[in-house]
Amino acid sequence: MHAEEIIRSIEAEHFKETLPTIYVGDTVRVGVQIREGNKERTQPYEGTVIAKRHGGINETITVRRIFQGVGVERVFLIHSPRITNIKVVRRGKVRRAKLYYLRDRVGKATRVKQRFDREL
């Protein structure tokens, strides 16, 4: 076997087939599995997708939310075994591929209009 075939076979084991279609501007709830001591639990993280990068097994999404008045961004590798589930809460209507301009906005200016022509 060539190196590429070995890499593809390993990637195929971790590739998640049942993920929803995620677009930039969507509000998503990501279930992240965390370990506290010897216990594991799923912690939800909800926010707006401001960027999507790469493709295939290396696909990442950057999710931004405001927590106690401070903007928090997390980058999730969506095919990671630590991600238990991803649910689209609402669709956003945007005209950019990257929403980095939301970092400079405060309060109600960070809202994204809702899009109704795509299914959840």
Curated annotation (Swiss-Prot):
It comes from the Bacteria. GO terms for biological process: translation. The keyword Glycoprotein does not apply. Keywords: Ribonucleoprotein, Ribosomal protein. Gene3D superfamilies: 2.30.30.790. InterPro entries: Ribosomal_bL19, Ribosomal_bL19_CS, Ribosomal_bL19_sf, Translation_prot_SH3-like_sf. PANTHER family: LARGE RIBOSOMAL SUBUNIT PROTEIN BL19M (PTHR15680:SF9), RIBOSOMAL PROTEIN L19 (PTHR15680). HAMAP family: Ribosomal_bL19 (MF_00402). This protein is located at the 30S-50S ribosomal subunit interface and may play a role in the structure and function of the aminoacyl-tRNA binding site. Belongs to the bacterial ribosomal protein bL19 family. This is Large ribosomal subunit protein bL19. It comes from Acaryochloris marina (strain MBIC 11017). The lineage of its organism: Bacteria, Bacillati, Cyanobacteriota, Cyanophyceae, Acaryochloridales.
